[in-house]
Every structure is written in structure tokens, then in C-alpha cells.
Amino acid sequence: MHLKRIAGLCLLLLTLSLSAQTHRSPELGLRYVAADSVVVWGEGYSDLRGMALGVDTALRETATLLPYSKRLQKDWLKHVVPQLALSGCRGGTDPIQTAVTDLAKAKTLFAATGQAQFMDAAERLLFNVLLREVVASGPGSFDKHTAAQALVDGTGCIYATDGDGLWINLFINSTTHVKTADFSLVVDQMTDMPFSGRVKVRLTGMPRNGFPLKVRLRMPGWVTGQLVPAGKYTYISTPPVAPTVYINGREGLNTVFDGGYVIVSRAWNRGDEILIDFPLSPCLVSHTVDGGSRTDIVRGPLFYAVADSCAQGNASIAGPLSEMRDAADLPLVTGRYADGRAFTAWPYFLSGSE
């Protein structure tokens, strides 16, 4: 795998000089690093691009940024956020098209504002709703192809840049060579998110050692105890605690938290590493709906479906929850209802493959 990564990186460096690398927002000045400039190394379900190309090998990133306006942001707050489920889905008569539209809105609004809440929404859409449609059994359909295209487009917002430095928005095993008018560097992100919480980022390829740069890493709402929309969802289990950021094995002291991002501002040397261990224990969440309540299960950005479909969302689910791994090393959640019956829950994206 290590040799494969090195060979792929060499190919990436050769091809990047021939292709346009960024998609820019005119508002904040953020530029997304284009999907074609990012090599995704994940295996199985964490490899969003690989899953998408399994549907259609000809898929390439499309231009999905919408014209930004204050009206678009107001529409998001008024019409999108109140309808969001823990899966990121809003439902409706055409849930996949709605999800694709919401992903485009989230990408646009993040590029214009730099607020992590929009990448939180994109992450949930990608790993729950859209991945579920791609994984679903049965012949290829229009919705499956549409969802696959959206997964490819989603890999075009893993990284972004501005005049100050690098933004790491999504935690996906990947490598990219970032080249802007202000700086150049190679970013190697090593992780098995969203199944395991460790994220290691190695920076190389800077013009020199001691190169000053700001690196922003998203601290997701699901790790800071912020459920969206607020007032609709409440943690029953103890909410996760934001992890410590380590630089070269030492706690990062020169960090600032702003807009849902940890900002590490320092002079970087080639080979410097950032390490974060995100807590990914399963949590019970109370969901207020129609004057009543139900109980759901989340683990990081993943929404979970209970094997007993008749009991999904049943308020009688009781803690504590336990985690186990299946034959494919996917995290399953086990627990009991208040009446003592046992249940098993699996990631929502697998619930359409039965």
C-alpha cells in the first residue's frame, strides 16, 4: 500500500501541472482543490470516489457551485435546516435530487462563509444518503447514477485554500499537491474515517523549511455536541468531547478555534504531521417530532438503522450501547430495549442493500 501511495503521488504531481486545480468562490476567496487533483486512497465504503466509479467509470467532477447570495443563505436557514434529519436527508418526493441540491448549496455557502456547519451537512449527505443510494442493491438507475456523480463532486471539497493557507474540510484518506499563487505543498491525509477516528496529516513539498502557513481543520458539530437543527435533537448519551490536536507528537498550543475550525498557525517544516483522534462511540439521540419523541443512534457522522425495522425510532431504546465489528470490519451497534429485547444496528448507508 505504501509503494502504491508513492507511485500514485508521482503520477499526481505530473498531471497536476497540466490541469486547472481549483474552483473558486468570489465571496470569501476560498478555492476548492478540484477532485481531479486529489487521489483518494480509501478502500471499501470509505472510498467515495471508488464507490461512485463502480457505477460509472466515466464520472468526473462537475461544476456544482451555485451563484452565492444572501437569499441562498436565508433559504438554507429557513427551509433546509429545520427539515434536516440526522442522516442529512430532507426526504420529499425526490430525496436523492433534494440531497444533490443541498450538497451544492452546502458547498457554495461554505466557500462563501468558511463556516463548518455547511461541511457538516455535506459530510452527512455523502456518507449517509448518497452513499446509501450507490450501495443499494439492484440495477443501475437514474437516482443511483445521480448519487454517484454527487459522490465524485463531494471529493472536490475535501480541501480548500485561501491566501493564508490550507483548509481540511472532509476527513478522507487522500493525497493532493496544492499549488496556489501564494504557496505550494503536498498534503497526505491518512485515515479510515468515518469508521475509525484517527486522522494523520503529513505536509511536505513546501518551498523551504520554516514556511509560515495556517492550516485549518474542521472540528465537526458531532464532536462538539452540536446537533442540527438545535432544539429538534438532544443527546441522551454523554456527547462526544472535542479531541486534542497534536503536532509532531506534541499537543498543539498555538491553535485557535473559529467558525468550527481549529487553526494551526506556525512555520512548517517538510514532513511535519498533525494528529487528531476523533471520538467515535455510538450515541443515543432524542428526536422531538410531532409533539412526541423517538430515539435514534448516531456514531460520528453516521446515522444508524436498527435491524428490527418495526422498532426503528422506538423511544424505548435503552442504553448502554456497545460496538462490535462485522466480517468486513464495519462498526455495528448493539443494545437493548427497555423491555430487555436485544437489537443490532448498522450504518444507514447499508440499509438499502438488503
Identify what each model region corresponds to.
Residues 12-20:
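Hydrophobic h-region of N-terminal signal peptides that target proteins for export
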